[in-house]
Amino acid sequence: MTHPVPDTGPASENMAPHRLRARPLGLFLPQQQPAVVMRTDCYICRSEGLAARSQVLIQAGGREILASLLHSSGEMIAPGEIGLSESAAAALGVAPGDAVSVRHAPPIDSFGALRGRVYGNRLDGAAFRSIVDDIVAGRYSDVHLSAFVTACSAFPLDHAETVALTGAMVASGERLAWGSDVVVDKHSVGGLPGNRTTPIVVAIVAALGLIMPKTSSRAITSPAGTADTMETLAPVNLDVGAIRRVVDHEGGCIVWGGAVSLSPADDIIIGVERVLDLDAAGQLVASVLSKKLAAGATHLVVDMPIGPTAKVRSPADAAALSGALQKVAAEFGLILKVMQGDGREPIGRGIGPALEARDILAVLEGRDPPPDLARRACELAGALIELAGRASPGTGAALAAQVLADGSAWSKFQRICEAQGGMRTPPLSNHRHVMTAQRPGRVSAIDNRRLAKLAKLAGAPAAKSAGLEMHVRLGSAVETGTPLLTVHAESQGELAYALAYAEAVGPILELSDR
């Protein structure tokens, strides 16, 4: 039901002060940030001094949100109307024509502490809780968020601050409990294409009776996140009740973390970090550990690939990050082990949701599996098994390989998929192009970042079947015409776009003389 509001100004006897008619615009902003659009000649903007990019309080039907204000001087918005972004309209639950009230947003109490941090002051737990609460409540605009991320990067968080931020992020959302002294989890630091070990690890450890409720992310800058890949095999958008049912029946799940409110501030902060290309160690540690603690983990293995084009580029960087993770985890009673690995090249053959899913199936079914993916999955699963006390030190990987070989992991994975809503077959691409060696030689270097960009230009992860299929590895000997990789796309245009990039960017795989 709509509530019409006249187009006239404040003198109209039928119009309550500061009320306008809602007009949903279908406008999407980064991080689903709520925004409203008002005319530059709107009497409310003039009387209240509402400038563009101001934070405003919007109320309708008992609901309220904070939103960023945009101005329009054209005919997009009629007199007496207010345009609403998609997230703003959804949060308010309004239909076209519904009455909406507008006023100045209240002051942000936590911003004083943040200003102090910009000038080098350390923050305590209360300050971080106040900041994180304001972030989750939507009181921080993208400008405020950028200031927070920059302040914590230019002047890095110390140990006490990292602990405080981690605790504040955990407290900002739901926290799951599983009624068990041992709940295992795994995290990959990232930066390596493919490397889709998580579904295999979950299947192995759940087959051994361990509890592993895995909440995973979608891709932000990569060709696929675990949730994107898993979605080609089974539904992943499960609420907390559904997650509990799956885990109660099967001991594990692989679901999208965005469907549940675990450390919600983390998702918001990560989005800003990506735009600013900032990835400070303290915030990374708080991000990883807050999600795992909120998910109820007691034992965690961190996969940390090291390589010149991976996220962690040197042994020194790996040692520093590993130490920080260990120290902060200990403050929360989380038992953690870091597994460093070779990050010089992709793991597995596929890069992109469906292609990575096919690698997972090949490993679980024992059907021509990529050896490196099977090996790394068993190493990580073995570390979790040992950490949980189910195997003596040095024997976990062999036990994981046995569970993989005898079909127990494959059977468990199928049951998890069915419990999540039914198993699916990953789609096949419509268009493919094989890139071949232009001369004889040996593969001496692989640029992970360029591979990831090539896969994204081909359409991944939005196009589930798009991406790359690797045919060679570091050290492979090739002749002229030897297939190096196949580009997969769902449309001819996306394929052409990806190939144009590959031709322009220079070598993605470098060949040396034999």
Curated annotation (Swiss-Prot):
Pfam families: Glycos_trans_3N, Glycos_transf_3, PYNP_C. This is Putative thymidine phosphorylase. PANTHER family: THYMIDINE PHOSPHORYLASE (PTHR10515:SF0). It is an enzyme of class 2 (transferase). Belongs to the thymidine/pyrimidine-nucleoside phosphorylase family. Type 2 subfamily. Keywords: Glycosyltransferase, Transferase. HAMAP family: Thymid_phosp_2 (MF_00703). InterPro entries: Glycosyl_Trfase_fam3, Glycosyl_Trfase_fam3_N_dom, Glycosyl_Trfase_fam3_N_dom_sf, Nuc_phospho_transferase, PYNP-like_C_sf, PYNP_C, Pyrmidine_PPase_CS, Thym_Pase_Put. Gene3D superfamilies: 1.20.970.50, Nucleoside phosphorylase/phosphoribosyltransferase catalytic domain (3.40.1030.10), Pyrimidine nucleoside phosphorylase-like, C-terminal domain (3.90.1170.30). Coiled coil: none annotated. One of its GO terms (molecular function) is 1,4-alpha-oligoglucan phosphorylase activity. It catalyses: thymidine + phosphate = 2-deoxy-alpha-D-ribose 1-phosphate + thymine. PROSITE patterns: THYMID_PHOSPHORYLASE (PS00647). SMART domains: PYNP_C. Disulfide bonds: none annotated. Its EC number is 2.4.2.4.
